[in-house]
């Protein structure tokens, strides 16, 4: 009796109830496809979406849990992980809405596509709360391998095959580098795998500073930077985004990136607490490079997907300002920006999917004159792009304001000024697309728009795509005006997470001698 109760308390399986719901949904999708075959495609996507929404409800009910540690200290269901897991689950639900018609039109299996995406979601959600090295690596590989499969899912498209091969080769190298850094951590901590135990052992040895720890830090940051598409580990992003199925790109740009930032916060703040100044310096450099290169190179792109690929690199640079700040406001602004980024970026990709389904192209020049043929699509895409650029009063404006203000309070003046300048640069290439869509002269319309077919909303999967566009449009428009509840949620997730509060206190203590001088 005592033994069983001890095991139950150590496992604390309730901490992964949201992931358990996703697992049940995944099994249900596979079994439903096996039993009912192609006839199941009319209801399997909605079953998956309901399962993901149920998972989000379970996450809501787990808020402020008195016992967040589970699975023998390998998983932490604190409020920070709850928010990141909700972002990933919600991004998957919206992506499935967007992908039904896209996958149907390519003639591939919708059930298998959803199953792979749910597996990636599962890996991302576990990664957000992983509190132990083995758990981190298994979750990371579950997310990565599923992403490789989704990237090459359209087997008949040579561009998809090329994107999958590039992603696999570069991703495998990145995983190997990350694993080597993790193995160094394991050795430096005398065989510990729990992050808090690693931090304690490393801090006790040589004051937490050694060449081995520096090498481990470099290798781990390289692996994380690949996942969040930070320069100079971004080379895969434009080619993979351009060649992959558009719904997959939408998921990678939001869900995978959110998981990467969750990993960065938990791993760096806990295991590398003794070298906080060093990793803050490295991420300052990564933020500068990402903001500059991402937004400048995006100016020269002719493909919408490549433009948004470089845009996502720049957006990662903005988010890193909050990470470098290392304060309550910094971490809160990171979470808030990722919340609003979910809606505006997925909304932009939903519009690109609809346009490509009608015209078969994603060239920016082919959007010329779209307003005359499809005003709703033009409005939705314009609002999402302007929000990404940070135009008030849309959600992206408040997201950037919170990030820049957090950076300014942390005395990161140069980083904030650079962020403002590159944000202005980004507005140019977003507005260029908007201006092209609203040209008034009929002779200025592109050939694709001139031959724009009538939208048949009665086709399978078209209504869900329309719902996805409308939902993201409303969320992007209202999230800016009603930003206070979202920011309160983000702030609560940070202030109630013990590991972040300890890190913030340590950061303040380390700054005292410098200030006194």
Swiss-Prot record:
One of its GO terms (cellular component) is plasma membrane-derived thylakoid membrane. Its main location: membrane. Its EC number is 7.1.1.-. It is found in: Cellular thylakoid membrane. One of its GO terms (molecular function) is NADH dehydrogenase (ubiquinone) activity. It catalyses: a plastoquinone + NADH + (n+1) H(+)(in) = a plastoquinol + NAD(+) + n H(+)(out); a plastoquinone + NADPH + (n+1) H(+)(in) = a plastoquinol + NADP(+) + n H(+)(out). It is an enzyme of class 7 (translocase). Pfam families: Ndh2_N, Proton_antipo_M. Keywords: Membrane, NAD, NADP, Plastoquinone, Quinone, Thylakoid, Translocase, Transmembrane, Transmembrane helix, Transport. It is a multi-pass membrane protein. The chain crosses the membrane at residues 16-36, 43-63, 80-100, 110-130, 133-153, 168-188, 211-231, 245-265, 279-299, 307-327, 335-355, 379-399, 401-421, 467-487. GO terms for biological process: ATP synthesis coupled electron transport; photosynthesis, light reaction. HAMAP family: NDH1_NuoN_1. NDH-1 can be composed of about 15 different subunits; different subcomplexes with different compositions have been identified which probably have different functions. Belongs to the complex I subunit 2 family. NDH-1 shuttles electrons from an unknown electron donor, via FMN and iron-sulfur (Fe-S) centers, to quinones in the respiratory and/or the photosynthetic chain. The immediate electron acceptor for the enzyme in this species is believed to be plastoquinone. Couples the redox reaction to proton translocation, and thus conserves the redox energy in a proton gradient. Cyanobacterial NDH-1 also plays a role in inorganic carbon-concentration. This is NAD(P)H-quinone oxidoreductase subunit 2. It comes from Rippkaea orientalis (strain PCC 8801 / RF-1) (Cyanothece sp. (strain PCC 8801)). The lineage of its organism: Bacteria, Bacillati, Cyanobacteriota, Cyanophyceae, Oscillatoriophycideae.
């Amino acid at each position: 009796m005592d033994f069983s109760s001890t095991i139950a308390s150590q496992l604390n399986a309730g901490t992964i109830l949201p992931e358990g719901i996703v697992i049940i949904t995944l099994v249900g999708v596979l079994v439903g496809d096996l039993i009912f075959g192609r006839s199941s495609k009319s209801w399997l996507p909605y079953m998956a979406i309901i399962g993901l929404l149920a998972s989000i409800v379970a996450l809501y009910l787990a808020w402020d849990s008195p016992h967040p540690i589970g699975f023998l200290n390998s998983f932490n269901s604190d409020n920070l992980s709850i928010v990141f897991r909700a972002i990933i689950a919600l991004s998957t639900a919206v992506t499935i809405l967007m992908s039904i018609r896209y996958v149907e039109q390519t003639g591939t299996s919708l059930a298998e596509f959803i199953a792979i995406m749910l597996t990636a979601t599962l890996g991302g959600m576990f990664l957000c709360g992983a509190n132990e090295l083995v758990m981190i690596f298994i979750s990371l590989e579950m997310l990565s391998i599923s992403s490789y499969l989704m990237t090459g899912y359209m087997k008949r498209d040579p561009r998809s095959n090329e994107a999958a091969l590039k992603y696999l080769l570069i991703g495998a190298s990145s995983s190997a580098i990350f694993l080597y850094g993790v193995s160094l951590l394991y050795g430096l901590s005398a065989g510990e795998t729990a992050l808090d135990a690693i931090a304690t052992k490393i801090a006790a040895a040589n004051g937490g500073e050694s060449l081995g720890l520096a090498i481990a830090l470099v290798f781990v940051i390289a692996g994380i930077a690949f996942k969040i598409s930070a320069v100079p580990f971004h080379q895969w992003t434009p080619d993979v985004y351009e060649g992959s199925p558009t719904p997959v790109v939408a998921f990678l740009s939001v869900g995978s990136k959110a998981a990467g930032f969750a990993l960065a916060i938990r791993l760096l703040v806990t295991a590398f607490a003794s070298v906080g100044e060093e990793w803050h310096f490295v991420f300052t450099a990564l933020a500068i490079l990402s903001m500059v290169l991402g937004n400048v190179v995006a100016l020269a792109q002719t493909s919408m997907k490549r433009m948004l690929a470089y845009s996502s690199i720049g957006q990662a640079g903005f988010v890193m300002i909050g990470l470098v700040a290392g304060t309550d406001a910094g971490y809160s602004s990171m979470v808030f920006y990722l919340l609003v980024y979910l809606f505006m970026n997925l909304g932009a990709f939903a519009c690109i999917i609809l346009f490509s389904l009608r015209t078969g192209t994603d060239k920016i020049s082919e959007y010329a004159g779209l307003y005359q043929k499809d005003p709703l699509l033009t409005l939705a895409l314009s609002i999402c792009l302007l929000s990404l650029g940070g135009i008030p009063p849309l959600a992206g404006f408040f997201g950037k304001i919170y990030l820049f203000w957090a950076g300014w309070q942390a005395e990161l003046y140069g980083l904030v000024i650079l962020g403002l300048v590159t944000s202005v640069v980004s507005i140019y290439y977003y507005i260029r697309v908007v201006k092209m869509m609203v040209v008034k002269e009929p002779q200025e319309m592109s050939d694709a728009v001139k031959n724009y077919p009538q939208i048949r909303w009665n086709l399978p999967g078209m209504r869900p795509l329309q719902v996805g566009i409308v939902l993201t449009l409303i969320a992007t428009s209202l999230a800016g005006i009603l930003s206070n509840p979202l920011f309160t949620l983000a702030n609560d997730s940070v202030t109630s997470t013990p590991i972040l509060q300890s890190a913030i206190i340590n950061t303040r203590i380390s700054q005292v001698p410098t200030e006194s001088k």
